[in-house]
Each structure stands twice: as C-alpha cells, then as structure tokens.
C-alpha cells in the first residue's frame, strides 16, 4: 500500500493532528484491546510523531521516544535489570498502530522502516528499543529486533523488550565479505590449475 508519511515534534502538531492521533490510539489500544489505561502521557511532549496518511486520512502511527526521556528514566528506575538500562539510554519506538481496515497490506512494516530510518538519522548508530506485545515478536524479528528481557505484563497485556542493534548487521556483512574473498580465491586457484593443465597437454 502506498501512503505518505509525516514526522513532527509535539509542538509542530496542529490541534487537528493531535485529535486524530489520540483518537486512533484510543481506538486501538483502549477500545480494540479492551485495555483501560491512561494513553496520554507526558512522554508525548518529547517525542517525534510519525503518521502515515492515505488520501489525507490517518491510517497508521508511531512515536519515536528520545534517549533518556522521562519514560525511559521511569522504566529504568523501576527495574534493576540490563533491559531497562538499555532502553533508558537508547531511542525507542512505541504506540505502533495500524487502523483495522488498513491491516494486511504491509503498512506496519513501512511505518517501522520509516521510524528506524528517522532514528538512525537523528540519533546515529545507537541501538533502537521497543516494548513489543509478544504476539508480534516474529514481525519485529523480521525487522532485525531481538528479545532481551523476560516476558512481563503491561496494562494486562504480555510484552517483551526487544532491541535493534547494528552489530549483527555489521557482523553479517563482514561474514559475507569473507565468504566472497574465499570464493574468489578458490576460483582463481581453479583457473590456474585449468591453465596449467592445458599447458601440460600442449607440451
């Protein structure tokens, strides 16, 4: 599905933008998931808000949370494990949603890809953290995220912390480079043996 993306700070959002964002978040995270919790929080003030539009209608959304934001600090303060520490010092992506009628067309992957790109542009090569609902683990793994915490309940829904790091990509790239060099070397050896064989037959 083709769509347009808009990335704004909280101060750049118009009242209409904010209305549609909060309406969508309430529709998905409160009504659809039957989860009574306070969706609006102070974290929104420090976030980048990424919206997917089709024909000027909001159809998907996520927010990019800055490193050392209020949310990250609060989570780290509540826990002594390494998972909270990682999320507290890295950017994270949250409130990822697609409106029900637009699901199944790859839009979630597009939004996450855009969010990751913006994280890299703004925060460099820092790992990117997410708090994922466990039924979406495979989806996030397909984007390169790996779990780094035990399962836990958040507002009555099972979650797991996941992180996207550049290390594995760099390692995989180095492995591919090494494999290519070995293959080229073997091809060179075979070519030399072939030439040597031809010379032997000619003699």
Tell me what each language-model feature is.
Residues 35-38, 47-51, 61, 95, ...:
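Short hydrophobic/aromatic beta-strand element in the GNAT-like acyltransferase core
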Residues 112, 119-133:
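Conserved GNAT acetyl-CoA-binding A-motif
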Residues 1-57:
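Short amphipathic alpha-helix that is part of the acyltransferase structural core
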Residues 1-16, 171, 179-199:
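Conserved N-terminal entry element of GNAT/NAT acetyltransferase domains
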Residues 153-186:
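C-terminal "cap" of GNAT-fold acetyltransferases
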Residues 51, 57-67, 72-82, 92-97:
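Conserved beta-strand in the GNAT
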Residues 129-131, 141, 146-161:
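Conserved catalytic-core motifs of GNAT/GCN5-like acyltransferases
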Residues 98, 104-117:
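Conserved acetyl-CoA-binding loop-helix of GNAT-fold acetyltransferases
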